[in-house]
Amino acid sequence: MVVTNRPKPEDVYSVESDALLPTEAGNFRVRVTVDDEGKEHSLLYTGLNSTTIPLVRIHSECLTGDAFGSLKCDCGPQLKHAMDCIQEEGCGAIVYLRQEGRGIGLHAKIKAYALQDLGLDTLDANLALGLPADGRDYEIAAKLLLEMGIDEVRLMTNNPHKINGLKRHGIRVHERVPHITGVGEKNKHYLETKGKRMGHLL
């Protein structure tokens, strides 16, 4: 739920802007903050109040999936589905983190894609480049939520690491809401790897 008189977390990021954002899913407000590395993270939200536990999605940037409609992953459909679900619920938020490629960056992600074209799976491709299988940190997401007074969420995720990451940084996860969408022939192996080797609940 949203605690309106909750003190802001220490070292909260600077708020750069907050404005109305009409979308195909419905009207949101978008709030952009800048972290201490200069990365801009966004919070897309609607209907936040002090009595309802909001439906929340933590979504890491995926240019290829979110913008280009790549079929190699399920990121684009997950983002759209989250926006639709939050509008239907009437209360929720999407934290959009600039953690492209599970935290390795766009350039490295495309290099990993090239290795996947040669037969490696999504995990082994990262490791072959000397990079972590998943380098994301959810402290950023927790701080953005706490800044808005949100300390308890219903989390749309298939990834237990997101649940644990939020809990470690002061966010109570009231409920995990499964978030399976966008499954197809092109990303079947990718999703199987996430389930079998990375602990995702698929």
What is the meaning of each model-derived region?
Residues M1-L202:
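Catalytic domains of riboflavin
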